[in-house]
Amino acid sequence: AVVTGDVQTQNDADRLARHTERLVQAVVTNGACHLDARQVNEALDAIDLEATDLLFIENVGNLVCPASWDLGEQAKVVLFSVTEGEDKPAKYPKMFREARVAVLTKLDLLPYVPFDVDRAVAEARRVNSGLEFIFTSALADGGLAEWFAFIRRTAGAVRV
């Protein structure tokens, strides 16, 4: 199941729902820059947790506010792409400090954008030396095995 967070729309939830039979529950924050535990708890009312093996919570899409809120998640995951610049960890240190894994996306664009992967990793590890990295490329199917392995490993340590 998936709980999505969005400031004004449920567009992300609608897009996901078109591609899965699993329940996708939208939380619209009406201007707030993050989800909070109460909102997630209310969204869970619509989900049959007994029949759910895995729950993803997609917080509102910024790297500032969501870092400060405990939603009961097993692990915080931060996604950033090569198109955003390797200085993201320096600009948003709290998110990278709180994250257990960073997923670097759009690696297939490296030939076309100025991005130094080693610098990005070094910047992130300055604020979180134990941060795990997964490198992905949707066009080349790169990194998905590592992502799935992380999910299996993390889901095996269920927090009740």
Model-derived regions, located:
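Nucleotide-state-sensitive switch-loop elements of NTP-binding domains
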Residues: 1-73, 85-87, 96
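Conserved Rossmann-like nucleotide-binding pocket used by diverse enzymes
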Residues: 3, 103, 134
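Residue-level signature of catalytic and energy-coupling elements of molecular machines
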Residues: 6, 58, 105, 120, ...
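Conserved NTP-handling cores and scaffolds of large molecular machines
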Residues: 11, 20, 44-47, 67, ...
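Short acidic active-site motifs
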Residues: 12, 91, 143
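Structural signal for conserved beta-strand scaffold positions within catalytic alpha/beta enzyme cores
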Residues: 26-28, 78, 135
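Conserved C-terminal guanine-recognition region of P-loop GTPase G domains, centered on the G4
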Residues: 62-131
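Canonical P-loop GTPase G-domain recognition
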Residues: 109-160
